[in-house]
Amino acid sequence: LLLKAIFKYHQRINSDGFYFDGTASTSQKITIEGGDLLVLRDDLIMIGYSERTTARGIDTLMRAIAEKGGVQNFIVVEIPKSRATIHLDMILTMVDRDSCVIFPPLVTGLHKCRAFHVHYEQKQVKRIVEYPGVLEALRTQGLDLKPVACGGDDELRQEREQWSSGANFFALAPGHILGFEHNQATAEELAKNGFEIVTADQVISEEHKLKPGQATLVTMSGSELSRGGGGCRCMTMPLNRNAVNW
């Protein structure tokens, strides 16, 4: 209710309201959490079907967005209903226009999650197409992403660092991301893929300034935060975003 009042009445927040108002719903079967919602482009949204976001919640949200006319294409990813994969952003987050950090077993491995492309026309579902994985589904929408492995090539480190929010990054801008410093194998993998690694203290003190065109991982301490289930993207609510130049 507090957030509802802020977004509705605060003078510094120019909001058109809510696509889905959870305080108005009395159904336990209609639930949505932000970690399952990834805005990939201004015309494409990805949603996780998880233990926290239900099928009815997804249907309600897609319909509400499509009725406003902005987005007609959705990718729905069915992820395991478990504590380790509580949200979609625990197994995949965007880190640049053309790359993402993934948890390999569930995105490219033998147990990769199914994905569905849901297309709306004239505010109605026109077609639903199933794909064997999320990256395959995204390619059909012109988004061919380069995956960077959480935990690197070692399966044990993949499991360990995914548990500690190693695939959960908050993008300050395309190529400028914030993540936990304790996920060292993931940071090493990002470095191999062209990311410069700096600390949050260096950025705050202006010892290091983020440069346009230079992919950069800003690391912060947060072992207790991830231990409690929080990731950098999980705990961030962007209030104002500039448009991305695709």
Model feature map: region roles:
Residues L1-W246:
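The feature marks the mature, well-folded catalytic cores of soluble enzymes
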